[in-house]
Protein backbone atom coordinates (compact mmCIF):
# COMPACT_ATOMS: atom_id res chain seq x y z
CA UNK A 1 0.00 0.00 0.00
CA UNK A 2 1.09 3.61 -0.57
CA UNK A 3 1.54 6.36 2.00
CA UNK A 4 -2.08 7.32 1.29
CA UNK A 5 -3.12 3.77 2.25
CA UNK A 6 -4.41 3.18 -1.26
CA UNK A 7 -3.96 -0.07 -3.15
CA UNK A 8 -2.51 -0.42 -6.64
CA UNK A 9 -4.27 -1.82 -9.70
CA UNK A 10 -4.03 -5.59 -9.77
CA UNK A 11 -3.26 -6.00 -6.06
CA UNK A 12 -4.89 -9.10 -4.53
CA UNK A 13 -6.81 -8.21 -1.37
CA UNK A 14 -9.82 -9.53 0.53
CA UNK A 15 -13.32 -8.16 0.97
CA UNK A 16 -14.91 -9.38 4.19
CA UNK A 17 -18.19 -9.25 6.01
CA UNK A 18 -17.44 -8.64 9.68
CA UNK A 19 -19.87 -8.61 12.62
CA UNK A 20 -18.73 -8.04 16.21
CA UNK A 21 -15.10 -8.58 15.13
CA UNK A 22 -15.92 -11.97 13.59
CA UNK A 23 -15.58 -12.60 9.84
CA UNK A 24 -18.86 -13.87 8.40
CA UNK A 25 -17.74 -14.02 4.76
CA UNK A 26 -14.40 -13.56 3.02
CA UNK A 27 -13.89 -13.00 -0.72
CA UNK A 28 -10.56 -12.76 -2.52
CA UNK A 29 -10.59 -9.93 -5.08
CA UNK A 30 -8.27 -7.86 -7.24
CA UNK A 31 -8.11 -4.10 -6.97
CA UNK A 32 -9.04 -2.33 -10.21
CA UNK A 33 -9.11 1.22 -8.90
CA UNK A 34 -8.52 2.75 -5.49
CA UNK A 35 -8.90 6.48 -4.92
CA UNK A 36 -10.25 8.54 -2.02
CA UNK A 37 -13.54 8.83 -3.94
CA UNK A 38 -14.06 5.31 -5.24
CA UNK A 39 -12.73 1.77 -5.03
CA UNK A 40 -13.34 -0.88 -7.70
CA UNK A 41 -12.80 -4.57 -6.89
CA UNK A 42 -12.91 -7.55 -9.25
CA UNK A 43 -14.28 -11.01 -8.43
CA UNK A 44 -13.09 -13.58 -10.95
CA UNK A 45 -14.31 -17.15 -11.43
CA UNK A 46 -11.86 -19.38 -9.58
CA UNK A 47 -11.39 -16.89 -6.74
CA UNK A 48 -11.19 -18.41 -3.28
CA UNK A 49 -13.61 -17.38 -0.57
CA UNK A 50 -14.75 -18.44 2.88
CA UNK A 51 -18.52 -18.89 3.11
CA UNK A 52 -20.81 -19.98 5.98
CA UNK A 53 -21.17 -23.74 5.76
CA UNK A 54 -24.90 -23.32 6.26
CA UNK A 55 -25.09 -21.19 3.14
CA UNK A 56 -23.20 -23.76 1.08
CA UNK A 57 -25.32 -26.70 2.20
CA UNK A 58 -28.68 -25.18 3.24
CA UNK A 59 -28.96 -21.70 1.70
CA UNK A 60 -32.51 -22.29 0.53
CA UNK A 61 -33.79 -24.07 3.63
CA UNK A 62 -34.50 -21.65 6.47
CA UNK A 63 -35.29 -24.56 8.80
CA UNK A 64 -31.66 -25.70 8.62
CA UNK A 65 -29.73 -22.45 8.35
CA UNK A 66 -30.42 -19.06 9.90
CA UNK A 67 -27.82 -16.46 8.99
CA UNK A 68 -28.70 -13.95 11.68
CA UNK A 69 -29.04 -16.52 14.45
CA UNK A 70 -25.50 -17.70 13.73
CA UNK A 71 -24.18 -14.17 13.28
CA UNK A 72 -25.63 -12.85 16.54
CA UNK A 73 -24.28 -15.86 18.42
CA UNK A 74 -20.82 -15.44 16.85
CA UNK A 75 -21.14 -19.07 15.77
CA UNK A 76 -20.64 -18.73 12.02
CA UNK A 77 -18.57 -21.63 10.69
CA UNK A 78 -16.76 -20.71 7.48
CA UNK A 79 -15.89 -23.22 4.78
CA UNK A 80 -13.56 -22.70 1.82
CA UNK A 81 -15.40 -22.25 -1.46
CA UNK A 82 -14.38 -21.43 -5.02
CA UNK A 83 -16.37 -18.86 -6.96
CA UNK A 84 -17.31 -20.40 -10.32
CA UNK A 85 -19.93 -18.48 -12.27
CA UNK A 86 -20.20 -14.76 -12.91
CA UNK A 87 -17.62 -11.97 -12.99
CA UNK A 88 -18.31 -9.10 -10.60
CA UNK A 89 -17.01 -5.55 -10.58
CA UNK A 90 -17.78 -4.10 -7.15
CA UNK A 91 -17.79 -0.31 -6.79
CA UNK A 92 -17.41 1.05 -3.27
CA UNK A 93 -17.88 4.68 -2.27
CA UNK A 94 -16.79 5.95 1.16
CA UNK A 95 -19.49 6.30 3.82
CA UNK A 96 -22.25 4.86 1.64
CA UNK A 97 -24.54 2.08 2.84
CA UNK A 98 -24.42 0.25 -0.47
CA UNK A 99 -22.13 -0.94 -3.22
CA UNK A 100 -22.87 -0.96 -6.95
CA UNK A 101 -21.97 -4.15 -8.79
CA UNK A 102 -21.65 -4.85 -12.50
CA UNK A 103 -22.28 -8.53 -13.25
CA UNK A 104 -21.21 -10.41 -16.38
CA UNK A 105 -21.80 -14.07 -17.20
CA UNK A 106 -18.21 -15.27 -17.36
CA UNK A 107 -18.52 -17.93 -20.04
CA UNK A 108 -20.33 -15.73 -22.57
CA UNK A 109 -18.95 -12.37 -21.38
CA UNK A 110 -22.51 -11.01 -21.57
CA UNK A 111 -23.62 -8.27 -19.20
CA UNK A 112 -26.25 -9.62 -16.80
CA UNK A 113 -27.32 -6.67 -14.67
CA UNK A 114 -26.41 -3.96 -12.23
CA UNK A 115 -26.80 -4.97 -8.60
CA UNK A 116 -27.17 -2.74 -5.56
CA UNK A 117 -25.98 -4.45 -2.39
CA UNK A 118 -26.97 -2.64 0.81
CA UNK A 119 -24.18 -2.99 3.35
CA UNK A 120 -22.27 -1.14 6.03
CA UNK A 121 -19.83 1.53 4.81
CA UNK A 122 -16.52 -0.16 4.13
CA UNK A 123 -13.50 0.11 6.40
CA UNK A 124 -9.94 -0.20 5.15
CA UNK A 125 -7.71 -2.85 6.70
CA UNK A 126 -4.19 -4.04 6.03
CA UNK A 127 -5.74 -7.04 4.25
CA UNK A 128 -8.24 -5.10 2.14
CA UNK A 129 -11.75 -3.97 3.04
CA UNK A 130 -14.33 -4.89 5.69
CA UNK A 131 -18.09 -4.31 5.52
CA UNK A 132 -21.26 -6.25 6.38
CA UNK A 133 -23.95 -7.39 3.96
CA UNK A 134 -27.36 -6.20 5.19
CA UNK A 135 -29.35 -8.61 2.98
CA UNK A 136 -31.42 -6.10 1.01
CA UNK A 137 -30.60 -5.78 -2.70
CA UNK A 138 -31.89 -4.19 -5.89
CA UNK A 139 -31.45 -5.89 -9.26
CA UNK A 140 -31.32 -3.40 -12.15
CA UNK A 141 -31.58 -4.51 -15.76
CA UNK A 142 -29.63 -2.82 -18.55
CA UNK A 143 -32.93 -1.11 -19.44
CA UNK A 144 -32.96 0.27 -15.86
CA UNK A 145 -36.06 -1.67 -14.90
CA UNK A 146 -35.50 -2.82 -11.34
CA UNK A 147 -36.81 -5.11 -8.62
CA UNK A 148 -36.17 -5.73 -4.95
CA UNK A 149 -34.30 -8.84 -3.83
CA UNK A 150 -34.15 -10.52 -0.40
CA UNK A 151 -36.68 -8.21 1.25
CA UNK A 152 -37.89 -11.03 3.54
CA UNK A 153 -34.35 -11.73 4.74
CA UNK A 154 -33.80 -8.03 5.38
CA UNK A 155 -36.98 -7.75 7.45
CA UNK A 156 -35.99 -10.85 9.42
CA UNK A 157 -32.59 -9.31 10.15
CA UNK A 158 -34.36 -6.24 11.53
CA UNK A 159 -36.76 -8.28 13.68
CA UNK A 160 -33.92 -10.34 15.15
CA UNK A 161 -31.90 -7.24 16.02
CA UNK A 162 -29.01 -8.05 13.72
CA UNK A 163 -29.74 -5.06 11.51
CA UNK A 164 -29.75 -2.09 13.86
CA UNK A 165 -32.32 0.72 13.74
CA UNK A 166 -29.77 3.39 12.82
CA UNK A 167 -28.60 1.20 9.94
CA UNK A 168 -32.20 0.98 8.71
CA UNK A 169 -32.46 4.77 8.66
CA UNK A 170 -29.21 5.01 6.71
CA UNK A 171 -30.43 2.39 4.24
CA UNK A 172 -33.67 4.32 3.70
CA UNK A 173 -31.62 7.41 2.88
CA UNK A 174 -29.40 5.34 0.59
CA UNK A 175 -32.45 3.98 -1.23
CA UNK A 176 -33.49 7.51 -2.20
CA UNK A 177 -30.03 8.12 -3.60
CA UNK A 178 -30.06 4.88 -5.57
CA UNK A 179 -33.51 5.57 -7.05
CA UNK A 180 -32.36 9.03 -8.13
CA UNK A 181 -29.37 7.45 -9.86
CA UNK A 182 -31.62 4.94 -11.61
CA UNK A 183 -33.99 7.66 -12.79
CA UNK A 184 -31.19 9.89 -14.08
CA UNK A 185 -29.06 7.02 -15.44
CA UNK A 186 -26.36 8.58 -13.29
CA UNK A 187 -22.91 7.15 -12.60
CA UNK A 188 -22.21 4.37 -11.98
CA UNK A 189 -25.53 3.17 -13.42
CA UNK A 190 -24.71 4.72 -16.79
CA UNK A 191 -22.77 1.87 -18.43
CA UNK A 192 -19.45 3.58 -17.69
CA UNK A 193 -17.82 0.23 -16.91
CA UNK A 194 -19.84 -1.87 -19.33
CA UNK A 195 -17.03 -2.33 -21.86
CA UNK A 196 -14.27 -2.67 -19.28
CA UNK A 197 -12.49 -6.00 -19.24
CA UNK A 198 -9.90 -7.38 -16.81
CA UNK A 199 -6.27 -7.90 -17.73
CA UNK A 200 -6.20 -11.39 -19.32
CA UNK A 201 -2.96 -12.11 -17.46
CA UNK A 202 -4.63 -11.81 -14.06
CA UNK A 203 -5.27 -15.09 -12.30
CA UNK A 204 -8.05 -15.60 -9.80
CA UNK A 205 -6.64 -14.60 -6.40
CA UNK A 206 -6.25 -16.92 -3.44
CA UNK A 207 -6.97 -16.16 0.17
CA UNK A 208 -4.05 -15.17 2.40
CA UNK A 209 -3.31 -17.45 5.33
CA UNK A 210 -4.25 -14.69 7.78
CA UNK A 211 -7.66 -13.98 6.21
CA UNK A 212 -9.31 -14.12 9.65
CA UNK A 213 -7.11 -11.53 11.37
CA UNK A 214 -9.01 -8.47 12.55
CA UNK A 215 -7.06 -5.22 12.52
Regions found by a protein language model. Give the residues of each.
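Charge-rich, low-complexity N-terminal segments
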Residues: 1-85
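Short acidic-glycine loop/turn motifs at beta-strand connectors
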Residues: 34-37, 106-108, 140-143
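Hydrophobic residues embedded in beta-strands of well-ordered beta-sheets
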Residues: 38-40, 111, 146
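Short, solvent-exposed aromatic-acidic interface loops
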Residues: 45-50, 120, 151-157
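A short, polar/proline- and glycine-enriched secondary-structure boundary/capping micro-motif
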Residues: 50-56, 126-127, 157-161
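Structured beta-strand/loop patches that form or line metal/cofactor-binding pockets in enzymes
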Residues: 82-136
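A hydrophobic, small-residue-rich beta->alpha segment in the mid-to-C-terminal subdomain
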Residues: 134-181
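Cysteine/selenocysteine-centered motifs that mediate thiol-based redox chemistry or coordinate metal-sulfur cofactors
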Residues: 173-215
Amino acid sequence: MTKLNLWNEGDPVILRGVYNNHPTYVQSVRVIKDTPEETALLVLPGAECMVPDGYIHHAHDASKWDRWQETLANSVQLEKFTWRTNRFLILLEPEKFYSTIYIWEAASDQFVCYYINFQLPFQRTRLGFDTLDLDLDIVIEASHEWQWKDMDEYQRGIRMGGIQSDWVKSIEHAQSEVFARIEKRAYPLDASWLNWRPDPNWSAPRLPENWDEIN
